[in-house]
Amino acid sequence: MARKVILDVDPGIDDAMAMCIALFDPGLEVVAVTAVGGNCDPEQATRNVQTVIEQLDPPRWPRLGAASPPDEGLPVDGRHLHGDDGLGETNFPVAERQHVHPSEKVICDQIRDASEATVTIVALGPLTNIARAMVYDPELHSVVGQIVMMGGTVSGPGNISPAAEFNIYCDPAAAKAVFRSLSTKTLVPLDVTNQILLSYDLFNQLPDETTRVGRFLRRVLPPAFRGYRQQFGVEGIHVHDTITLMAVTHPELFTTEEMAGEVETSGELTTGMTVFDRRRVPSWRCNMDVVVDMDAKAVTEAIISGIHRAAARER
């Protein structure tokens, strides 16, 4: 039976790539895609979720959730890598939708509508929606199956500040609330996702433009390559969110350790930093599994094969 998942995304080019794979994966039933502000503002993120789904036209359309601003506003965005529209300045046309419920309501409704503890939340952006859902439904932790989160670092540097990773930095208070929740959680940090760089050679292995998936990715990815070259001087792009999806679909390719993690919310230089008690005799209680390594070659192959499978399953 297919695994029920909710994709919580801030598209974002790598979010869009993850959606391409997940929406056509026969092992997944994507019951909802919920938007959150991060790489772009909440309104644009909501539009982009709808854009990706319209462009791909998967066999089963999931419920959509609309993003709203975090309580303290977004401190940063990802326009330097993803463009003003979050999808590489592609400006796809999109139909106007009415009555899209807030993301946190959609999350709670889908989890409550399913059999107990069978839905996995794949959180690929800031954790704003997940924290709000836990306020909206205080017992959510007991009925969600698992939360798999892309974010944070264990021992490496951040990517938006010297100490903080982008998703956690965008809404550290929300991340702190989710880290402290009683839910079953797995964190996929930068230490691991930075191991893979999607190169031009891999780009050339994508499906061609006769498929919707190939046409979409070949339009949105080139601006990301330019952004990474201009910002970082590298010939390739990181696909943090797609790797996180692989941790759900191919867990055998990843190594995890149980850890005790917290989020710094008030440091002058360290706001958004993820802190783990890794002392020989820790005093914090373990609260999540953290991915510490992966078979990078096999994960890369799984990403490419997942995209080709998506193109082959277009109706």
Predicted ranges, named:
Residues 3, 46-114, 286-299, 304, ...:
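Metal-dependent C-N hydrolase catalytic cores
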Residues 35-38, 67-69, 266:
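Acidic/polar N-terminal loop/beta-strand segments that form early-domain functional surfaces
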Residues 82-84, 129, 240:
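Histidine-centered active-site/metal-ligand motif
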Residues 2, 21-24, 29-30, 169-173, ...:
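Conformational coupling and interaction surfaces
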Residues 64, 178, 245:
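A residue-level signal for conserved active-site and pocket-lining positions in enzyme catalytic cores
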Residues 40-44, 73, 153-157, 262-279:
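Short, mixed-charge aromatic SLiMs
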Residues 2-9, 13-51, 93-195, 200:
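Active-site histidine-anchored catalytic micro-motif
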Residues 77-85, 161-165, 203-204, 278:
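Short, surface-exposed amphipathic charged segments that create phosphate/polyanion-binding patches used
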